[in-house]
Structure formats: structure tokens, C-alpha cells
């Protein structure tokens, strides 16, 4: 699954992306654009509920990649992101051919977990869904959460401001 402008920073209604990551810092959420495909719809003719999770996952990995975090680097360190909880609030249906923007922002607290807030919007700026996920970084050998995922992401990232770590 790929967005047309993976890694674009834009708000609904913006036609051009002209700012660099450095200019924006973490002032606006990271956004990927995805066109709803016909095979992703269900018998009601709207986007199948499970596909929202795929769109959210695509945006999260695109953000990590834009921040300079490679999946291979995590595998080499024997760590990986894990989702512990996800809540989806459906606001408006999406149909085949609809252009969407999926935003992604990491929110940091203390401890082993973090929150990822995401919004799926239509081309005209209407909110189609809101997603909130609790995640962590798993030690792949010991099968336990790392005590400080924030510090680990900061070490791995070449653009930590994209993850609100600047």
C-alpha cells in the first residue's frame, strides 16, 4: 500500500508542499495520502473497517522511515514496535476512489508506552475516522517492553523532530 505523496506535510486544503522537515519541526502532523481502492470496500460499498488499521499502520511506518528509522536497524537491535491497544472512531464513510490523508503524531509520556494519534480525512477536509493507539518497543529476545522507548527512538532517528522528540 502506498500513498501518492508519502511523507508529505500538508493540512486539508493545501495544494502544495513547500516546507522542509526542518522548517516544520513537529508543528504539524505527518501525513500520507492514500486513494481508497475498490477491493478494500465491503458489501455496503464503503471502506472495510479492517482497512482503516492498514492505513494507520502504513502512515506509522512511513513516519518512522521519514524520521530515519529503518526496520532493518530495529531488527539488528532485536527490537520492534508493538501495538497494545487501538481505538477507532468512525465519523464518515469512505468509498472506492476517495482520496484520503492519514495523519500520524507520536505523543510521549513517561514509562514503557507511548500514544499515536491518527486522523483519516477526506480530500475536502472532513474527518472520516480518528484512531488512537497505545504502543511500545518490544525486546524481541526477552519478549518484554523496553523501559524507555522515547530514548531508543531518539537514538535511532536521524530526524527526531518528526516524532516529537526534538
Segments predicted by a language model, with ranges:
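Short acidic, Pro/Gly- and aromatic-enriched capping/linker segments at domain boundaries
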Residues: 34-36
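Early exported N-terminus immediately downstream of N-terminal targeting peptides
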Residues: 32, 50-52
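Helix-adjacent hinge/juxtasegments
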Residues: 75-80, 84-106
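Active-site helix/loop of acyl-thioester processing domains in fatty-acid/polyketide metabolism
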Residues: 52-75
Amino acid at each position: 500500500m502506498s500513498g501518492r505523496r508519502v511523507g508529505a506535510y500538508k493540512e486539508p486544503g493545501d495544494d502544495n508542499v513547500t516546507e522542509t522537515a526542518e522548517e516544520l519541526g513537529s508543528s504539524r502532523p505527518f501525513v500520507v495520502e492514500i486513494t481508497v481502492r475498490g477491493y478494500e470496500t465491503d458489501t455496503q460499498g464503503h471502506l472495510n473497517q479492517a482497512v482503516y488499521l492498514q492505513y494507520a499502520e502504513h502512515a506509522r511506518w512511513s513516519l518512522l522511515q521519514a524520521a530515519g528509522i529503518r526496520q532493518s536497524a530495529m531488527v539488528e537491535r532485536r527490537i520492534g514496535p508493538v501495538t497494545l491497544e487501538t481505538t477507532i472512531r468512525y465519523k464518515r464513510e469512505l468509498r472506492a476512489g476517495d482520496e484520503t490523508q492519514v495523519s500520524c503524531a507520536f505523543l510521549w509520556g513517561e514509562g514503557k508506552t507511548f500514544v499515536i494519534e491518527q486522523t483519516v480525512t477526506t480530500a475536502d477536509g472532513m474527518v472520516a475516522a480518528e484512531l488512537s493507539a497505545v504502543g511500545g518497543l518490544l525486546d524481541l529476545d526477552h519478549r518484554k517492553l523496553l523501559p524507555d522507548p522515547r530514548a531508543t527512538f531518539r537514538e535511532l532517528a536521524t530526524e527526531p523532530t518528526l516524532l516529537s522528540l526534538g
